């Protein structure tokens, strides 16, 4: 893996960790920064509201000049997502990709796609047909799937105020856990470094990378 590619991915991960407002989480799988998972909540006012949607992310060797490969791990009833495989039809993940895009911007685009499906360019033709011909049935089924398949993962709440760990933002703890560190170690280091909020983390030298250095030593 090239140093430039590695640095780019590491920077994107750090940016996601520090951006609390985006409501996006990204973490590595088995410490492999070419294979990640992303997660976001279903948008309010849609059949996906209240759901937590996990996306598998594979980073190509020539990233960011080629788009990441993204598939929904969470089953979702949507015209632009295969109900069988989770494959996604979204232009910026194909021919409209640009190196200025990031994993975060791609995940935000996926979240926006849940607000504005494009049934004229479907990934799942059967779902698109229901969307166009019987919209109320589409909404009912999408809500049922959200309820059945998109429950919050254990221990994850993107909005929660933490009281258990001395007021430390739970998103910080959850994000650091994805790097394989124990909760006990994370809390101990964050308390020692006086990190409770995303703002504290932003002001910390080197941000999330600075905390990762502390956890490794």
UniProtKB/Swiss-Prot annotation:
Task: Please provide the record's keywords in A-Z order.
Answer: ATP-binding, Cytoplasm, Nucleotide-binding, Nucleus, Transferase, Ubl conjugation pathway
Enzyme class, top EC level, equals transferase
Q: SUPFAM superfamilies of this UniProt entry?
A: UBC-like (SSF54495)
Q: Does the keyword ATP-binding apply?
A: yes
- A single Pfam family it belongs to is UQ_con
Q: What does the UniProt entry say about where the protein is found?
A: Cytoplasm; Nucleus
Q: List the disulfide bonds.
A: none
- The molecule here is called Ubiquitin-conjugating enzyme E2 1
What organism is recorded for this protein?
A: Schizosaccharomyces pombe (strain 972 / ATCC 24843) (Fission yeast)
Q: Which gene encodes it?
A: ubc1
